[in-house]
């Protein structure tokens, strides 16, 4: 997600590993404006720190300190999605879960100003100003 542009990129996948993370970074790379560079904040989940992770040239990874989810703006976004679009539901199968997640993400993108309001931390505002 990009609070400055009030937008984001996501892939809904059924696994979390270095291959999935590399696919996400490749997708994100394609969404970055020409001659721009993205900084991606990440915790140190296993699939974020493997040696075979493919990081495109227009992306830099910044790792947060251990046990500090409050520093990661994406955590507020996930909480919003869970609380407002995915909670109190029963899904018949994996395909239905994937569809619901895609609908939730696309609905979030359609809410003008939502990503900015959830993810614009004061220190991010200072960095992008």
Where are these regions (language model features)?
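Short functional hotspots at interaction and active-site rims
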Residues: 1-129
């Amino acid at each position: 997600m990009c609070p400055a542009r009030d937008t984001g990129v996501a892939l809904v996948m059924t696994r979390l590993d270095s291959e999935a993370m590399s696919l996400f970074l490749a997708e994100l790379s394609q969404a970055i404006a020409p001659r721009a560079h993205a900084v991606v904040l990440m915790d140190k989940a296993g699939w974020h720190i493997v040696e075979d992770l493919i990081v495109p040239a227009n992306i830099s990874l910044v790792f947060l300190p251990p046990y500090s989810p409050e520093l990661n703006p994406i955590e507020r976004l996930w909480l919003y999605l869970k609380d407002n679009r995915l909670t109190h539901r029963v899904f018949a199968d994996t395909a239905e879960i994937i569809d619901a997640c895609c609908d939730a993400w696309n609905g979030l993108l359609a809410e003008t100003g939502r990503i900015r309001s959830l993810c614009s931390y004061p220190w991010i505002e200072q960095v992008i100003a």
